[in-house]
Amino acid sequence: MRYLTAGESHGPQLTAILEGVPAGLELRAEHINKELARRQKGYGRGRRMQIEKDEVKIVGGVRHGKTLGSPIALVVENRDFQHWQTIMAVEPIDDETEVKRKVTRPRPGHADLNGALKYGHRDMRNVLERSSARETTVRVAAGAVAKRLLEEVGIRVAGHVLEIGGVRAEKLDYRSLDELQKVTEESPVRCFDPEAGQKMMEAIDLAKKNGDSIGGIVEVIVEGVPAGVGSYVHYDRKLDAKIAAAIVSINAFKGVEFGIGFEAARRPGSEVHDEIIWSPEQGFSRRTNRAGGFEGGMTTGMPIVVRGVMKPIPTLYKPLGSVDIDTKEPFTASIERSDSCAVPAASVVAEAVVAWEVAAAIVEQFGQDRIDLIKENIERARRYAREF
């Protein structure tokens, strides 16, 4: 399974082409729209979320509510495009006013300057339109399809916010993914700990008041993946490596860890590795899950636990210093409409990219063409693991 996306932040639409999704999977627009709505929520979002109400159009690969096995084409229209039709026109324009509106002041922390250097753009709108986090809309749409596939084979994915602006959730005594999802969906910052959630909102308010932005940490948990998914044979087949790459590919994400993560550097081995246990009912398992569900690039059968670190959004309403690429004069960076904190929304994006990588690994390992055969094969693998 793989996918490609296309489209600009203020262009007419965003498009995703999904290849390798097996035939026979029940899929409707409402499955995807539910995830798109979750992405648009979250305390600290900017005014654009009041403009856009994202809805998907499935324009290929699905008929009568089921996937065909052919590429799936998804389209999400940008409702704000009506205000950008001239400046984002595909054909050449003669409007001198619009031509002169080019972006020549790169924003610190963005792709603007590096992208202009790479592609030779003198108008950095050509960079910022594509590098915008708006592109994650269709990545969430692709992830929704992956989640639908995982649901069919008994695998659950859930995400939540662990930390925003130095405020960390301490109460994480949820008893199931159902409880975690229920509580976080009701939280404006997608935090399970209500006291921490309130302090997170206060931190966001303060950052907004100061014309600043703040980042945080999100966590994604995947339950139900059988042991042995992924591979130790080659570096590029390790599933944890693929998930790590997917996490840091999200806009503004700068770090990733599994299980106890970087804490492992501060502990002795006896407090890092997970003891192996066995029971007639479950077969082999682990006493703890410090490894976060992975050993040797393969799943252990324990829940996958992965965290991603998101830096503060670099678009600031009190801009940092920059230099105009045309005049070479120092200036304060240009301002695009932005959020003061996008960590809650980013947790939904993180769910999506993790779901896609897990689903792709499941399809690769347990059969590629039909969902019914994949379900049979994965159930056979679960029985084998219990009886091993």
From Swiss-Prot:
SUPFAM superfamilies named in the record: Chorismate synthase, AroC
Cofactor details (free text): Reduced FMN (FMNH(2)).
GO MF terms held by the record: chorismate synthase activity; FMN binding
Keyword Transport: no
GO biological process per UniProt: amino acid biosynthetic process; aromatic amino acid family biosynthetic process; chorismate biosynthetic process
E.C. code: 4.2.3.5
Cofactor(s), names only, from the UniProt record: FMNH2
Sequence positions that bind NADP(+): 39, 45
Positions contributing to FMN binding: 130-132, 251-252, 296, 311-315, 337
Stated name of the protein: Chorismate synthase
Keyword Lyase: yes
Subunit text: Homotetramer.
Primary role: This reaction introduces a second double bond into the aromatic ring system.
The encoding gene: aroC
Species of origin: Geobacillus thermodenitrificans (strain NG80-2)
One CC-aspect GO term: cytosol
Top enzyme category: lyase
Record field: catalytic activity: 5-O-(1-carboxyvinyl)-3-phosphoshikimate = chorismate + phosphate
Pathway named in the protein's UniProt entry: Metabolic intermediate biosynthesis; chorismate biosynthesis; chorismate from D-erythrose 4-phosphate and phosphoenolpyruvate: step 7/7
